[in-house]
Each structure stands twice: as structure tokens, then as C-alpha cells.
Amino acid sequence: MIKPTPAAVGSYVTRRCDRLFKSAAAAAGSTVVAAILLIAIFLLLRAVPSLRANHANFFTSAKFDTTGDKNLAFGIRDLFMVTVLSSICALVLAVPVAIGIAVFLTQYVPARLSRLFSAMVDLLAAVPSIIFGLWGVFVLAPKLQPIAVFLNHNLGWLFLFKQGNVSLAGGGTIFTSGIVLAVMILPIVTSVSREVFRHTPLIQIEAAQALGATKWEVVQMTVLPFGRSGVAAAAMLGLGRALGETLAVLIILRSAARSGNWSLFDGGYTFASKIASAASEFSQPLPTGAYIAAGFALFFLTFVVNAVARAISGGRVNG
């Protein structure tokens, strides 16, 4: 009988460990997928009875009345409007600033200072959202009131700046919440953009410099084109963060007695803040299911946004 050599035994053990590790990794990956599916199924199952009992159009109605099982009439029109408008406002404000910071940190600042400034930007992500909300209400809103009045008086013919459904005096508008959200998503967009710009091939930068390009021309011809898809992915990740923000928006936005009209000076609720505001009343199944239906809409919206971000970042880095 031929005995296996130590090398053969070692090879068998290695292959067995590889199979075990592969199985463990596959199980871990499957757990994530299963968790997402289970959450979606839970939301859908709890939402369906309320959707069947709903007396309003779920997608087009601005009414959200859950006072009783027999009087359910709820829709997500206003929730969708406030959520999307405040998030898009945040994105429009945050992305240019984030790109500027990322270019500054990777192309203009020495490595030691770049690490210091990067840590300070990343530290912004550690600030609790309730602090941002309080800052928005007590500090930012009063400062923004003259700007809001100016925009409303001079650009009121444009739907974004016409009079909303809440008073400009209080500052509890989408305009204020959008700016606060812009500050909150700034670290995410900056961090991803910074890492993308940092991996710009040195040969491309040196080639541009050899042609006599200035620092800005180097950035314009090499760094920005290379990081185009990375910045787009960073923006989508920031958008996903803004869509799901709850506490800061709940503190800032004023409730409105009438429907919004796609103005930055509207008030109301986002999906997340509406659910959070009624969390203490989740006792009856059908009214609770109405909020769960809104949560499912938010879940689907954020899932799509993050899937798009993943698809963009999975493509060529230089677009």
C-alpha cells in the first residue's frame, strides 16, 4: 500500500479549507441577499391589506388619513414630492462643493495636510443628525429667511421659487432642509470622489504636464475625465443617504395644511419623517400598514438609487 506523501496530504487539506471558506463566503453573501428579500416581503405583506382598504389613489393622492380602519385614505404624492425635491436640492448643492474639495485635497495640497483636511471632512459624517436638525432650525433658518424672500419676490414666476404651503418666516421649508441635507451628504460624496481622483494614472498627469499644461488644465484634461463615473456614483450614494434621512428633516420641516406644488418653499413630510412622526401610534394593523406602504415605496426608491450607483461605479472609472 502506497502512503500519501506529506505534500499530497497538505494539498488535500488546503483544498478542503478552500472549499470550506468558499462555502462560508457564499453563505455570508446569501445572508445579505436574503435579508433584503425578507425586508421587502415583510413590508409588502404588511402593506397589502391597507392598500386594499385604501379609498384614495396611493400614487396620486396628497391625502394621508389613517384615523380608522374604515376611513383609510392615503397617498404618497406629497411625501414623494418633498423627499425627492429636498434630496435633489441637497445633491445640486453638495456635488460641486465635494468635487472642489476632492480636487483640492488630491491635486493642490501636500500629502500631510491632505490627510489632516480629509480627516476633518470625514469627521463631519460623525455628527449626529439631530445636531444638524437643531442647527438648521435655530441657526440656518433665520439666516436663510432674507434669501428665501428675495428668491420668492424676484424668481417667483419659476415654480421652484413660488410661494409654498408654509410661511417663509419660520424657515421650515424644503429649501432649508435641502441645505442641511447637502452638508450631511458632503462627506460621502467628497470621500468617494477623493479616492477616485487619487487613482488618476500618473502617466496621464505627466503627459499633460509635458505638453505645458497648467495645474488647472491638468485637472480639466486628466483628473476630472478619469473620475467622471466615480463622481456620478458618489452623487448617487449621497442621494440615497439624503432620501432616507429622518430626524434632521423631521425637526426642520413644518407640517402643511394643504398640498405642495413642487416649490422649494413648501413644507410637509418626507417618507421617513412621516413614518417617524407617527411611530408612537402604530397599534392598529390597517393604519400601521398605511405607513408601512409608504416605507415600502421609500425602500424601493432607495434600492433603485443604490443599484444605479453600483452600476455606475462598476463601469469604467473614466466613464
Curated annotation (Swiss-Prot):
Residues 80-309 form the ABC transmembrane type-1 domain. The chain crosses the membrane at residues 25-45, 84-104, 120-140, 141-161, 169-189, 233-253, 289-309. One of its GO terms (cellular component) is plasma membrane. It comes from Mycobacterium leprae (strain TN). Belongs to the binding-protein-dependent transport system permease family. CysTW subfamily. It is a multi-pass membrane protein. Keywords: Cell membrane, Membrane, Phosphate transport, Transmembrane, Transmembrane helix, Transport. PANTHER family: PHOSPHATE TRANSPORT SYSTEM PERMEASE PROTEIN PST, PHOSPHATE TRANSPORT SYSTEM PERMEASE PROTEIN PSTC. The keyword Phosphoprotein does not apply. This is Phosphate transport system permease protein PstC. It is found in: Cell membrane. Part of a binding-protein-dependent transport system for phosphate; probably responsible for the translocation of the substrate across the membrane. One of its GO terms (biological process) is phosphate ion transport. Its main location: membrane. PROSITE patterns: ABC_TM1. GO terms for molecular function: phosphate transmembrane transporter activity.
